[in-house]
């Protein structure tokens, strides 16, 4: 491996690279490049990357964080959807021989196969500065597809990071909170203001670390059923749980069966989905499974 040092993350160097390639930001890809070395260091520290690690980076942009990851990890695979960035990445990463750039949509990449080839199927670490519009599908895809993951350390919209770690009874609590907390332990490790990016986003961001559980914190017989119940509960969050589930095509149970399942769990017929904990949703799914 080369002895090169990461040099991107400095606004001046970033502008030089963009001008050299006459790069135009693509709004449809939600591109905001990091230009703050302190934040980059914080992400690398929070991800707890060592020389034994294989790291998957989603959305490397011009390779700013990739340079830092390549310094810290054994090997990095960086998946970039924007074809116009590939020649830039080949240039900015030429001094690191432990980086593979993959020009593809992360939702179409077989990450399990990648982990098998690059890491003998052992758990990988995921690091990303995610476009806001696609945060949820990417995170849920990583969790639901049974990819072997140790942790996910990501930059997301502050509001999304908050939603991932809140509990019942708060306005931000929802299906994403429950899904993340079923698979991982979430921890916000840094708040990042808009001036740390180019171009500046309109909202604040946060770095959140999701440490994958070896086993989920609750026992549930049918995961898919539990998540269908959760989605139905929050699709009409102002309705009672009975009405929310009764009106949902995802939950094939009658009003009587719904009331019976709630009774088995000792839950009020007037309760709303937003009041239930993950454990209570698991109990409810198990009650439905036993009907």
What are these regions (language model features)?
Residues 1-228, 232, 263, 274, ...:
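Catalytic cores of RNA-modifying enzymes
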Residues 212, 231-291:
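C-terminal lobe and adjacent flexible extensions of AdoMet/dcAdoMet transferase-like proteins
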């Amino acid at each position: 491996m080369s002895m090169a040092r990461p040099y991107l993350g400095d606004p001046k160097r970033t502008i030089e690279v963009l001008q050299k390639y006459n790069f135009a930001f693509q709004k449809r890809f939600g591109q905001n490049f990091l230009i703050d070395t302190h934040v980059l260091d914080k992400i690398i520290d929070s991800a707890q990357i060592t020389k034994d690690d294989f790291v998957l980076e989603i959305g490397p942009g011009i390779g700013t964080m990739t340079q830092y990851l390549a310094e810290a990890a054994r090997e990095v695979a960086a998946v970039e959807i924007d074809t116009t960035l590939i020649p830039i990445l080949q240039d900015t990463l030429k001094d690191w021989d432990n980086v593979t750039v993959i020009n593809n949509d992360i939702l179409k990449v077989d990450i399990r196969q990648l982990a098998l080839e690059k890491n003998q199927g052992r758990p990988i670490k995921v690091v990303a500065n995610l476009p806001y519009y696609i945060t949820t599908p990417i995170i849920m895809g990583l969790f639901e597809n049974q990819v072997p993951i140790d942790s996910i350390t990501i930059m997301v919209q502050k509001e999304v990071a908050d939603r991932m770690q809140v509990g019942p009874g708060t306005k931000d609590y929802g299906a994403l909170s429950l899904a993340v907390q079923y698979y991982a332990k979430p921890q916000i490790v840094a708040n990042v203001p808009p001036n740390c990016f180019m171009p500046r986003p309109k909202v604040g961001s946060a770095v959140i670390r999701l440490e994958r559980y070896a086993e989920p914190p609750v026992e549930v017989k049918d995961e898919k059923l539990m998540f269908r119940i959760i989605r139905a509960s929050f699709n009409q969050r102002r309705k009672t749980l009975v009405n929310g589930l009764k009106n949902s095509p995802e939950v094939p149970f009658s009003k009587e069966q719904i009331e019976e399942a709630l009774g088995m769990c000792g839950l009020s017929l007037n309760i709303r989905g937003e009041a239930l904990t993950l454990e209570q949703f698991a109990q409810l799914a198990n009650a439905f499974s036993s009907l």
